[in-house]
């Protein structure tokens, strides 16, 4: 994607905002090369040219690509454990208006996409705008199509922009957006392009903060917009994997056709063998007469076949290092011990690091989702966030258990809790723990209410 804008030349754009927008463009452009590199490693598109040590792999094979899914695994396995399930208040009750916003924006399905982008590049962004049909429109954006400036004093973004129109397939990334939203504390500036000319339209709002919220993974004081899961040590281990698999592949080729030798033959016999190498390799018989010049009998032999075991051992070592660096289990990165299979309890113990990381991810993303929910409610009701009532302000994001225990385990725990705590079996939490989805729970509650209604009618009729 190409983004070429001179902010001061945009028709109708405030000069102060044009200066901040230029800073945003500088930030966005400075991150594009690194983001593109992380995208390549996520997609497994790593060529031998960038990993070759120049010892065992010929330079001519630099363009060869070896597939590696470790970059994808680093992101997707953790993202799969962050399962957003909607919003509830502190009493555990849902908000009908907020449920409608979640459903209309398909947030439960869109969140995993935003989470993967967040883990891949360090952050992703949610933007909000008023919508006459559904009240509030919520969209998620990758760091490749959005950028923001951080306000350290307020602990949130100062301003940001997001590309609104969808990217088109063009050669060499030549596509240029034609619609960009620029978000400030008091307005959304809509920047639209007609040919090579840009114009700006200001849409004021009363939120008092940009209608843009980042989802940030593992932020630090020096990196408020977080860090990618595909960081430098991870990329180096992926390079080691690609290099080792390439060496193993080449070694296997030589093992398939081990080197042979034939001594004491005439020049004619030598030429015949050299000119028909493949035929001599696959043939069942190799015949040669005594050398009439020397009287020697030809001697045939084969050098020791290559061994692929060192390459396999190296892959296991790399997988173990990768597991430690990423928090994934060694099973996730492809190391399986068939001779002594890992028990389910051992696998669960190995995944505790990943579960802890998922809980931390849910906590930080939960705060961002709560802010998004409050802004969405405020936009829908035409008020500021400060004007929301206390019940609305108590909204929190709900996530499923990142440990992903089996239904049998959670059901057993639920039954034990119900036996010790009176009334627990009547709650929605109990039904969730024994394996029912929110849709099933609603159907169960509706049918229970219908049954109670029929019973009440029967009592009235009998009396």
Predicted regions and their residues:
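Extended, regular secondary-structure scaffolds
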Residues: 125-230
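Extended, charged amphipathic alpha-helical segments
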Residues: 201-349, 388, 398-402
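Long, compositionally biased
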Residues: 256-260, 351-373, 451-463
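Hydrophobic, well-ordered secondary-structure elements that form the walls
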Residues: 322, 369, 430
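Active/binding-pocket-proximal capping segment
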Residues: 322, 336-343, 375, 379, ...
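Extended amphipathic alpha-helical segments with heptad-repeat/coiled-coil character used for oligomerization
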Residues: 367, 380-416
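Long, highly charged low-complexity segments enriched in Glu/Asp and Lys/Arg with interspersed Ser/Thr
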Residues: 434-461
């Amino acid at each position: 994607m190409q983004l070429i804008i001179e902010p001061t030349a945009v028709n109708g754009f405030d000069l102060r905002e044009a200066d901040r927008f230029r800073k945003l463009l500088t930030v966005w452009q400075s991150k594009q090369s690194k983001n593109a590199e992380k995208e390549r490693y996520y997609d497994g598109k790593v060529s031998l040219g960038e990993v070759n040590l120049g010892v065992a792999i010929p330079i001519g094979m630099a363009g060869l690509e070896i597939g590696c899914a470790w970059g994808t695994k680093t992101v997707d396995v953790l993202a799969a454990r962050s399962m957003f399930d909607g919003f509830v208040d502190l009493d555990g009750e849902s908000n009908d208006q907020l449920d409608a916003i979640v459903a209309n924006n398909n947030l439960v399905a869109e969140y995993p996409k935003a989470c993967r982008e967040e883990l891949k590049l360090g952050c992703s962004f949610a933007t909000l705008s008023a919508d006459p049909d559904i009240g509030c429109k919520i969209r998620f954006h990758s760091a490749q199509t959005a950028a923001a400036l951080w306000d350290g004093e307020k602990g949130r973004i100062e301003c940001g922009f997001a590309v609104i129109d969808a990217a088109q397939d063009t050669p060499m990334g030549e596509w240029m957006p034609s619609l960009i939203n620029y978000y400030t504390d008091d307005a959304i500036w809509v920047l639209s392009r007609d040919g090579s000319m840009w114009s700006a339209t200001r849409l004021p709002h009363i939120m008092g903060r940009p209608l843009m919220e980042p989802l940030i993974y593992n932020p630090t004081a020096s990196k408020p917009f977080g860090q990618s899961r595909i960081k430098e040590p991870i990329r180096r281990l992926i390079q080691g994997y690609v290099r080792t698999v390439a060496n193993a592949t080449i070694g296997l080729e030589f093992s398939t056709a081990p080197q042979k030798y034939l001594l004491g033959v005439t020049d004619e016999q030598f030429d015949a063998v050299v000119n028909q190498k493949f035929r001599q390799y696959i043939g069942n018989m190799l015949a040669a007469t005594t050398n009439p010049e020397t009287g020697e009998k030809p001697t045939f032999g084969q050098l020791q076949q290559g061994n692929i075991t060192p390459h396999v051992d190296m892959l296991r070592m790399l997988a173990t290092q990768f597991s430690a660096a990423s928090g994934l289990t060694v099973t996730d990165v492809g190391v399986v011990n068939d001779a002594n299979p890992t028990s389910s309890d051992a696998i669960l113990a190995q995944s505790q690091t990943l579960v802890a990381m998922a809980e931390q991810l849910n906590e930080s993303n939960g705060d961002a989702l709560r802010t998004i929910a409050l802004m969405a409610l405020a936009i829908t009701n035409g008020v500021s966030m400060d004007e929301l009532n206390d019940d609305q302000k108590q909204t929190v994001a709900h996530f499923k258990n990142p440990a992903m225990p089996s239904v049998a385990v959670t059901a057993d725990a639920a039954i034990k809790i119900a036996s010790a705590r009176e009334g627990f079996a009547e709650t929605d939490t109990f039904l969730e723990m024994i394996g029912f989805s929110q849709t099933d729970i609603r159907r169960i509650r509706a049918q229970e209410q219908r049954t109670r209604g029929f019973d009440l009618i029967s009592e009235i009729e009998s009396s």
